[in-house]
Amino acid sequence: MFRNTLRTFPRPATPSLPTSSHSPIARASLSKSPLFVLSLVLVCIFFLSFLSHPDPSARKLQWPGLFPSPSPSVIHTKDLFLERALNATSEAFREICPSAGDPVHLDPDLTEAQKKRYLPLKRSKRGRYLLVTNTRQIEAHLPDLLNTLIVLLRYLAPEHLAVSILEGPSSDCTQKAIEQVLKPMLDDQGLESAWTRIETGESKIDWGKHNRIEKIAELRNTALAPLWQGEGDQKWEDEIEAVVFFNDVYLHAADILELVYQHVKNGAGITTAMDWWKKRPEYYYDVWVGRTIDTGDLFYPIDNPWWSPSSDLFPNSPNSRNAYSRLEPFQVFSSWNALAVLSPKPFLPPHNVRFRRGDVEKGECAASECTLIATDFWKAGFGKVAVVPSVQLAYERDVAKDIIEDVGKQKEQLGWIDGVPPEHLDDKIEWSTKPPKKVRCHPWPEVNGLSANVWEETRWVQPWLE
């Protein structure tokens, strides 16, 4: 549509100058005229706007375009059924969110090698993988999320999935897109309503009245509640194979499948990706949550009361550092990193683990709700926590593109082919059954509000309270 529209606009005629202006004296006089300068500026702006096609989802200063951005390209796959579903959903999404950008992942499908690798996840004896998220304001992320869900439904089949989404509040098109595009798409792809719970339009939170960790834990528990509550008359707890909890990041189906594959293969309690705030230079995002298995230290120890670049990860954990450099899964004490696969068993009787804030009255350090989940998994006997560094995620579009490029090059150098690692980099994790003797903690201040500086205080504490 854009190309046809573009041809209907006449190219602006170049204004002719008076004949006398060709003389050096006339040109000098004219160049000093305010009207001439203004005209020149306007012509430059016009041509810059003519050439510019800003990306609405990119969070950076961009030159405004004269015309709308080009329509997204049609997705082509070998699977025609998948191709139709992807393109039909994309078209429906564009009608709801016309200003949204394209997906970051231009090819949402799996490679043939990946399809072969993940076959064990779709065997008939397998249960369902419960996809869970708390989300808001994700217009930019929705194209990739929609594609991811469609590919997972097509590859795993609807009988192997369940979905729980808690949204809001959003001021962009997120709520409308979830209600009018995502939910109908799940129905069209065969996921029964008994295996979906989608709640939108959550009220705005007055953070001045809430402890951040306590409130976020409450929201996570609400999103996860169908695991133990079910939906309608349908019980979920007996059929959920694994919980896949994700944040507002740019996803690809292979990200989720690789994490679930490693989780099942290694018999883990929690398996996570890596997430980044920035990639150039590197700022590891979930630094407040992650702890190493050997020393209990941060993945990137911060010695100053502020966040600093983290290109030198795991300086105090040689085994973790070596595995990370080779993109091999490795054990940690705790991690979340935007995408976490969790065993459902600790959330169910007799353990009944929940996201929570620290019990300060008992002397427990006020850690993140995600650190405390790992702590409670350890305590319940599910302390096999792993990071899969080949899956790296970003919250910002530009960072996601940097990751795709940088990790893609690293995988190529390491011998990955079609998204699958070489055999010598695909061993099982050798688990330690013991946690670190002490774990580093930066307590959240006992004040209400959304933000605080946790780096001002450092404690070394027992892995968990008895």
Curated annotation (Swiss-Prot):
It is an enzyme of class 2 (transferase). One of its GO terms (cellular component) is Golgi membrane. Its cofactor is Mg(2+); Mn(2+); Co(2+). Pathway: Protein modification; protein glycosylation. Residues 1-33 are cytoplasmic. The keyword Membrane applies. Residues 55-466 are lumenal. It is a single-pass type II membrane protein. The keyword Chloroplast does not apply. InterPro entries: Mannosyltransferase_CMT1. The chain crosses the membrane at residues 34-54. Residues 1-23 are annotated as: Disordered. GO terms for biological process: protein glycosylation. Keywords: Glycosyltransferase, Golgi apparatus, Membrane, Signal-anchor, Transferase, Transmembrane, Transmembrane helix. It is found in: Golgi apparatus membrane. One of its GO terms (molecular function) is glycosyltransferase activity. Divalent metal cations. Mg(2+), Mn(2+) or Co(2+) can be used. Its EC number is 2.4.1.-. Responsible for addition of mannose residues in an alpha-1,3 linkage to a polymannosly precursor. May be involved in synthesis of capsule glucuronoxylomannan. This is Alpha-1,3-mannosyltransferase CMT1.
